[in-house]
Regions:
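Bacterial N-terminal signal peptides
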Residues: 7-15
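N-terminal active-site segment of His-dependent metallophosphoesterases
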Residues: 20-85, 89
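Beta-strand-turn-beta hairpins that frame and shape the catalytic cleft
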Residues: 22-33, 136-157, 265-272
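Acidic/histidine-rich helix-loop elements
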Residues: 34-52, 73-81, 107, 165-174, ...
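Binuclear metal-dependent phosphoesterase catalytic core
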Residues: 36, 142-145, 240-247, 261-328
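Active-site environment of divalent metal-dependent phosphoester hydrolases
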Residues: 42-44, 75-80, 99-110, 163-166, ...
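His/acidic metal-ligating clusters that form di-metal
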Residues: 63-65, 154, 169-262
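Extended active-site neighborhood of metal-dependent phosphoesterases/phosphodiesterases
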Residues: 84-196, 292-297
Length: 328
């Protein structure tokens, strides 16, 4: 009975969210995403005030078409009030937003499923779920062309779970095989509907893939940004990156989790990027807090991306052009 009720609530929330907002390129052929990550918000804790301040400053400056939260939104109780406080900063501006969970979100007294139901009640929410596969926040956000006639960009959102579930293997969990198959099936569907041509796509989740460390340690890889710590990636590689290369659609992957990294490195033709830590001093951090911005141009390969902090921007690069130029 509980499972049936949860499923009905999910369906209601999904239908409401999808009917309320359609993502599309604007008349100038642009679509802008702001990525907030690791807000680590604690309700009524003065150390979190700067995170709300920065969120609003970034939104004032960038005026995005979509806000993506890539996990660890909250870091203390009461969980519901904390989640609402953070997401309402975006919702009150009538900006569509979406969330994927991090390893700390469900450690504050509410499960992922309970947090998901709360998020569904917040206006302008696009967070969804896919029944029957591992995790809660697995869903797709298509971005329509400026005339609304076709899917021009696909945003894949995945749940990277929390901690390893395999005895004897420590650290963090990997994105599971059924999630990878779900991605592959949908990628094939979109490619087939697009006359056999992959639709440019981006992916968002919380915990970095093992390929981040491989790329960051390669002398031949071009990197922009700051790397102050090794990626806390899963010890085991479940093959998501290989699938994305095989499908040929994903141009960029955006994660959080490692607070002292904000770099973006090109690896095997794909941009592996971190967001900028958005939180306050509720947890470790050694970078001025801010956000990553991603600007897509309709009909153009790649994208432009930069970091926005208090009163300034940095690391403004165009992918893949800036990386190919730096390699020469």
């Amino acid at each position: 009975m509980k499972k049936l009720l949860f499923t009905l609530l999910l369906l209601i929330g999904i239908v409401f969210g999808m009917s309320a907002q359609t993502l599309k390129f604007n008349a100038n052929g642009k679509f802008k995403i702001v990525q907030f990550t690791d807000v680590h918000y604690i309700q009524n804790d003065p150390r979190s005030a700067v995170s709300v301040e920065r969120i609003n400053e970034v939104l004032d400056a960038e005026k995005p078409d979509l806000v993506m939260f890539t996990g660890d939104v909250i870091y203390g109780k009461p969980a519901e009030e904390g989640m609402r406080t953070v997401l309402n900063q975006v919702s009150k501006r009538n900006i569509p937003f979406a969330v994927t969970f991090g390893n700390h979100d469900n450690e504050q007294g509410l499960s992922r499923e309970e947090l998901f139901k709360i998020i569904q009640t917040i206006p302008n929410n696009l967070t969804s779920t896919t029944e029957g596969i591992s995790g809660v926040t697995n869903y797709i956000l298509p971005v329509k062309s400026s005339d609304g006639s076709k899917d021009a960009e696909i945003l894949y959102v995945l749940d990277s779970h929390s901690y390893s579930q395999i005895e004897g293997i420590g650290g963090y969990d990997y994105i599971d095989f059924d999630q990878i198959q779900w991605y592959r099936d949908n990628s094939q569907k979109y490619t087939k509907a697009n006359a056999g041509q992959p639709i440019p796509s981006l992916a968002f989740f919380h915990i970095a893939l093992p390929e981040y460390n491989q790329a960051a340690s390669s002398e031949s890889a071009v990197m922009f940004g700051i790397r102050k710590e090794k990626a806390c990636a899963p010890q085991l590689n479940s093959g998501l990156f290989a699938s994305m290369k095989e499908m040929g659609d994903v141009e960029g992957i955006f994660v959080g989790h490692d607070h002292d990294d904000d770099y973006a490195v090109m690896w095997q033709g794909v941009l592996l990027a971190y967001g900028r830590y958005t939180g306050g001093d509720t947890v470790y951090n050694n970078l001025p807090n801010g956000a990553r911005v991603i600007e897509l141009t309709e009909g153009e390969k790649g994208f432009r991306t930069w970091i926005r902090t208090k009163g300034s921007t940095e690391q403004n690069v165009k992918f893949p052009d800036s990386y190919l130029k730096a390699k020469r």
